Design a protein with these regions (language model features):
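Short N-terminal helix-initiation segments at or just after the protein's N-terminus
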Residues: 50-64, 191-201
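Proline- and acidic/polar-enriched loop/turn elements at helix boundaries
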Residues: 46, 82-83
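Short Gly/charged-rich anion-binding patches and loops
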Residues: 29, 65-68, 109
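His-Asp-centered catalytic microenvironments across diverse enzyme cores
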Residues: 3, 7-22, 39, 83-215
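Cysteine-centered nucleophilic/redox motifs
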Residues: 55-82, 114
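Secondary-structure boundary elements
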Residues: 1-57
Length: 215
């Protein structure tokens, strides 16, 4: 699949200017640069330039800045997506004990990525890919670059609330959110199946900053 691309033009906005200052002049190079940045908590996720200032970011901030770059250059076809997928023990063996403890087959987790036309792209880390979680995708919605904080959490929690009701899961929202946090803790403990050097396509795995994504 050929990578979607466009030129970054001067005078279009703050994100474009940041990339040009780094001698990055097209979307392909910009997305490669973003994927290569460290996965880390951002000090202010409401600041669209935070990935440059912090020299890293999460799945939210990394894809938000690419969406903003596209908008600045008249490329509205680059959409920012929020997906909810089944996080199960097949995907992440390290959470099996917690899922078994609470008698759950999986727990719905959130992730950000891009959709361009009929193709999906994940620039969370080098080698990240949509196909790694596509088969487990439960829901997705388009959001804007300035909706990755409160709106993302609200969407995720509302999805969980409906899931609990529809699937007749015997937990309330706060209890299932606590189980989710335990799963996240499990993901930060390297196992033989998931060595510490393995890069997951989903933003949270093996990332010590992950719990701050929802703080």
């Amino acid at each position: 699949m050929e990578m979607y691309n466009f030129m970054i033009n001067e005078g279009k906005g703050p994100v474009s200017e940041k990339f040009i200052a780094l001698n990055i002049h097209d979307f392909d190079a910009a997305s490669t640069f973003i994927a290569g940045l460290s996965y880390k908590r951002n000090q202010d996720k409401n600041n669209i330039l935070c990935v440059f200032e912090d020299k890293g970011g999460t799945c939210s901030t990394k894809h938000a800045v690419l969406r903003k770059l596209a908008l600045e250059n008249g490329q509205d076809s680059v959409k920012l997506m929020l997906g909810i997928f089944k996080m199960d023990s097949k995907y992440a063996p390290s959470i099996k004990k917690t899922l078994d403890q609470y008698r759950l087959a999986y727990i719905p987790e959130a992730h950000n990525y891009l959709k361009i036309g009929n193709h999906y792209y994940d620039f969370t880390k080098p080698g990240s890919g949509y196909n790694d979680f596509k088969s487990n995708l439960l829901s997705e919605t388009e959001i804007e670059h300035d909706q990755i904080t409160l709106e993302k959490i609200t969407f995720h929690r509302e999805f969980l609330r409906n899931w609990l009701d529809n699937e007749r899961i015997g937990y309330n929202l706060e209890e299932i959110w606590s189980v989710r946090e335990k799963c996240i803790e499990d993901l930060q403990k390297p196992t033989k199946e998931e060595p510490e050097t393995n890069f997951s396509p989903v933003c949270f795995q093996n990332s010590p900053e992950v719990r701050d994504e929802y703080k």
